[in-house]
């Protein structure tokens, strides 16, 4: 009988670790499950690349944990961050700019630039609002300082910041998934979440995969 990945994992190795998550979620089916639970139906993942390197010869290059592409050619960037030693939102801003430079061919109109999705999963609630999920919306502020949602100011960038510090505790699939990412154990797999778990993890049973 083959050993399972749980028997081979270093102590305290969980899916929040980018080392582990990039191995698991480069599997298209696992990534599809992740995207479906977080973004909802309607996003068919057609390809996945882990550790996607965007090289810049003059300025800082970036390496994305997971970059998926949908049937609608919309990039979905998934990032896992344990530490709080940098500015997460500015990191996403820089990643977005780097992705954009590879999306629009010369001669194309800006309106042809596809939507891009950022799913940024952190250990801590760095925003500090006491919420599990933060979705960023662009809005308008007038000269009196009043914010209005009356005007459509979307630019095609979708940002979701999800933390593992504040549990949802609502029994939803997302609740199960986040608990499983935080504590990736066989016990939690059985109690919490199935589709992204054992089936895909068993494909990476030996230490050399990590």
Predicted regions and their residues:
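Elongated, amphipathic alpha-helical interaction scaffolds
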Residues: 1-204
